[in-house]
Amino acid sequence: MNKIFQLIFCLVFSQSFAQQTSYKTLVDLPYYEKPGKDIYQNERCKLDLYFPMTTQNFPTVVWFHGGGLKSGSKEIPEQLKEKGLAVVAVNYRLHPKVNAPKYIEDAAAAVAWVFKNIERYGGDKKQIYVCGFSSGGYLSLMVTLDQKWLKKHKLDANAIKGVVTLSATTFTNHTIRKEYGMEITQALIDQYAPVYHARAEAPPIMLITGDRKKEFFGMYEENAYLRRMLKINGHLENDLIEIGGYGHEITEVGIPLLLKKINR
């Protein structure tokens, strides 16, 4: 009976907290410090910031959309709203208008913007999580594991609180393979592969995939290989979760796991 009462109390309290907290969304904020001569960069490299106005020192999720580096647009997932945290949804330049490494450069610039600006809105820059779905998860891993991208912005990738990816590519992204003239089914690990940069001191990483029998391009196996290489290199805080019965589209069931990671 005690446990039932406690559960009811927690539910009522959390609903009451959500109702009392006001949220604001700022749209199309440019994340490069100075406009360049590249018109496409100036048009595309923007982010939306959703944040609680009545709380302080909240965590922030930087969210990169999917689309194979060829399509997609910034969107704040509904499941991340009204959870006492900020969400930064990022647009980045897309193929064929650009090629690698422009996608990664944009992702790093967006993460750098969050580190440099989130405190102005009440957030805690020590609680920044970098997350994404599919190619967005790929970008999350690249800017975290390959330290050179954030180093260009005078930031340490190890300052990221954690990484959660949903159905991410961990080998060289298939669109980049196409840029090389390769078939997308031909595996490649080079400088543009997250697994190439597996290292011991990286932030905590949670890898989530769909069912290995239903996922795209051996996605589960790629994630399993990254986790194995992280462990071999001495990385301690990593998880691999396979969601049975689901294919590539796992955002709806994956985001609750992301929230659980943040709330640990």
Label every PLM stretch briefly:
Residues 1-24:
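Bacterial Sec-dependent N-terminal signal peptides
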Residues 224, 231-264:
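C-terminal catalytic histidine-bearing segment of alpha/beta-hydrolase fold enzymes
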Residues 57-68:
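Short beta-strand element of the alpha/beta-hydrolase
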Residues 29, 115-178, 189-190, 194:
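Primarily recognizes the serine-hydrolase "nucleophile elbow" in alpha/beta-hydrolase
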Residues 19-55:
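N-terminal cap/lid segment of alpha/beta-hydrolase-fold proteins
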Residues 154-158, 162, 168-176, 184-228, ...:
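The feature captures the conserved acid-bearing segment of alpha/beta-hydrolase catalytic domains
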Residues 73-90:
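Short amphipathic alpha-helix adjacent to the substrate-entry channel of hydrolases
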Residues 98-119, 142:
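Alpha/beta-hydrolase active-site loop
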